[in-house]
Structure formats: structure tokens, C-alpha cells
Amino acid sequence: MTGEYRMAKDIGLGVKPPRRECDDPNCPFHGNLRVRGMILEGVVVSDRMDKTVIVEREYYRYDRKYERWERRRSRIPAHNPPCIDAQEGDKVRIAECRPLSKTKSFVVIEVLERAQER
């Protein structure tokens, strides 16, 4: 962290920038990372990795043969910038970006609800 405060840039998605500042080059607000594509919501189920969280989202799929809806889930690794600092149990919004690693192509852009508030 530097001494002076850098203004967070607008990422074009209508989300409020975080109050904290970071020096992460892969932060969409304070770094050089561009976001584009899908915007998803889910719950953080793991935050044990460094600057990475696993976001789980549930969705429903219709099975025509049995005429029923089945509940499915997907687990998406996402980059967690230090200025956002999402923790396990938080409801977050993630946005697609360029591939950051072999499995990470999403970044956390907003914490919708903290775990202790739920």
C-alpha cells in the first residue's frame, strides 16, 4: 500500500468501488485488469488459497424425460483482490476476465452480503 490514495477507476458495470486501496495488478479497480463477458452471483465456499476464492452457484435444469427440475451447482475459482477481501460464506458478484491462471478466468467485483450479516 502506498501513502497517497489512488482513485478507484470505474469498471463500467455499475458497482461501487471498494473503500480500501490495493497494489494488485489483477484488480479491476486499482490494476490493469479488464472485465468483460458473464457476470455471476454465488457464495464463497473456500478462501484458503492466496488471493483466490471458490464461488459456488446453484441453478436448476429441466429434465424432459421425467418432467422434473433438478438442482445443480457449479464451483468457479475467482481472483480475490486485497481491496475486496471476500471471505467464506460471503455472497459475491464475479465478472469474467482474461485467464489469470490455468483455472481462474473470473474476478470478484463486489461483496453483496457479508457472512456475519446473514
UniProtKB/Swiss-Prot annotation:
Question: What Pfam families has UniProt attached to this entry?
Answer: Ribosomal_S17
The alphabetized UniProt keywords are: Ribonucleoprotein, Ribosomal protein, RNA-binding, rRNA-binding
Q: Which GO terms describe its biological process?
A: translation
Give the transmembrane ranges: none
Against InterPro entries, the record matches this protein to:
NA-bd_OB-fold (IPR012340), Ribosomal_uS17 (IPR000266), Ribosomal_uS17_arc/euk (IPR028333), Ribosomal_uS17_archaeal (IPR019978), Ribosomal_uS17_CS (IPR019979)
The record's Gene Ontology cellular component field reads:
cytosolic small ribosomal subunit
- Record bears the keyword Ribonucleoprotein: yes
Q: Which GO terms describe its molecular function?
A: rRNA binding; structural constituent of ribosome
Report the domain of life of the source organism.
Archaea
Physiological role: One of the primary rRNA binding proteins, it binds specifically to the 5'-end of 16S ribosomal RNA.
Question: Known HAMAP family for this protein?
Answer: Ribosomal_uS17_A (MF_01345_A)
Report the sequence similarity comment from the record.
Answer: Belongs to the universal ribosomal protein uS17 family.
Q: How does it assemble?
A: Part of the 30S ribosomal subunit.
The protein's name is Small ribosomal subunit protein uS17
